[in-house]
Design a protein with these regions (language model features):
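Hot-dog-fold acyl-thioester-processing enzymes
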Residues: 1-84, 147-149
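HotDog/MaoC-like acyl-thioester-processing domains
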Residues: 2-10, 90, 94-99, 103-149
Length: 149
């Protein structure tokens, strides 16, 4: 279960238990729902002719999956608002069949100046594949309630 603002400390780290093996259906559904017509995500022939030689998983799916995996352990039940995502990088591609796992580390904490009983937590979220390659990373800031409020 997620924690409240006053229960976090800088340096707290979570290796999220939930993992996901990305399927063709995951990629196809997300790509079509978001109207992304990039052939590298949809066209096996075009993808085979690319430098990657196979279909690439949509990067925004990878990002969304990373955030989704972290919610139960970070913000579920204590979130007031997501404030933003910074320094999003995708240093390695994700392919169909990759198994992805996420981790989170608190890198900044500060009580809200305008909202008593609330505070801002910034996590570094990372996602790795089964080869332990970093495939996605970002900083996420969220406004959380304090348990003591």
């Amino acid at each position: 279960m997620a924690r409240f603002f006053d229960e976090w400390q800088i340096g707290d780290r979570i290796e999220h238990a939930l993992r996901r093996t990305v399927t063709e259906t995951d990629n196809l559904l997300f790509t079509t729902l978001t109207h992304n017509t990039q052939p590298l995500h949809l066209d096996a022939e075009a993808a085979r002719a690319s430098e990657f030689g196979q279909i690439l998983v949509n990067g925004t799916y990878t990002f969304s999956l990373m955030i989704g995996i972290t919610v139960a352990d970070t913000t579920a039940g204590s979130l007031v608002a997501n404030l933003g995502y910074d320094k999003l990088t995708m240093p390695k591609p994700v392919f169909l069949g990759d198994t992805l796992r996420a981790s989170s580390e608190v890198v900044e904490l500060r009580p809200s100046k305008s909202r008593p009983g609330q505070g801002i937590v910034t996590w570094r979220h990372q996602m790795h594949n089964q080869r332990d390659e970093l495939v996605c990373e970002c900083l996420r800031s969220a406004l959380l309630r304090s348990r003591s409020a």
